């Protein structure tokens, strides 16, 4: 199960309704922060979302509305006596940006910071993909690994309740039970892992389509409603995001990075749903669970 908290869904500068981009992805003990706009530390702490429980931070690009909150988050981690390693993914200039800021502010983290290109453990993988913005930028793909589970309904139907037999089946072993050979492949089912994709800032981009095919949720740049100048600034219109979701056969589209010029966003959702019906436009502090 994956939970996604939409901490900030705005763009450029904060508005009364929308803070700057930040998304907290939780997956059974691994908390991932995607982008870190100004004020993210306040949101995390004010709503008790566990700032020190964040293990991995992924930054999409170096524009201020996506990265200016990172120093504050790391400083708060230090003040809270963090000991665990913090893993960071991001553009090439991110490391220099952070350590230069540490030097000028005389801040020395009490914990290890490790810059990585991807992440892999027994439960999830995190990889990046190319996006099309005005500066170096990347999106993120978080994938749960497939899990093998015992078919409990079939066990109950066949009245197999001996825990020793069930354990052997889980271990992939053939076992004899009441004169019958039980083969593990007949009692094990594969639960497909969930997939979450986040684009950061991007114009319509084939590399995005290719990278997010079939994901459970696509969180896509939807800065403008219908502005010809969107591409000049390296952004997408709502209809662009919907067309990409449709072409990539994603299960759910979340429109985000909404320009502060829009107070009423009802038309955004209408336009998106004409093309891709399974579209949502999350408010700040809303969340969604992917099972």
Swiss-Prot record:
Its EC number is 3.1.26.11. Keywords: Endonuclease, Hydrolase, Metal-binding, Nuclease, tRNA processing, Zinc. GO terms for molecular function: 3'-tRNA processing endoribonuclease activity; zinc ion binding. Its cofactor is Zn(2+). Binds 2 Zn(2+) ions. Transmembrane segments: none annotated. It catalyses: Endonucleolytic cleavage of RNA, removing extra 3' nucleotides from tRNA precursor, generating 3' termini of tRNAs. A 3'-hydroxy group is left at the tRNA terminus and a 5'-phosphoryl group is left at the trailer molecule. It comes from the Archaea. InterPro entries: Metallo-B-lactamas, RibonucZ/Hydroxyglut_hydro, RNase_Z/BN. Disulfide bonds: none annotated. Zn(2+) 1 binds at residues 61, 63, 133, 201. Zn(2+) 2 binds at residues 65-66, 201, 257. The active site is at residue 65. Zinc phosphodiesterase, which displays some tRNA 3'-processing endonuclease activity. Probably involved in tRNA maturation, by removing a 3'-trailer from precursor tRNA. Belongs to the RNase Z family. HAMAP family: RNase_Z_BN (MF_01818). Homodimer. PANTHER family: ZINC PHOSPHODIESTERASE ELAC PROTEIN 1. NCBIfam families: PRK00055.1-3 (NF000801), RNase_Z (TIGR02651). This is Ribonuclease Z.
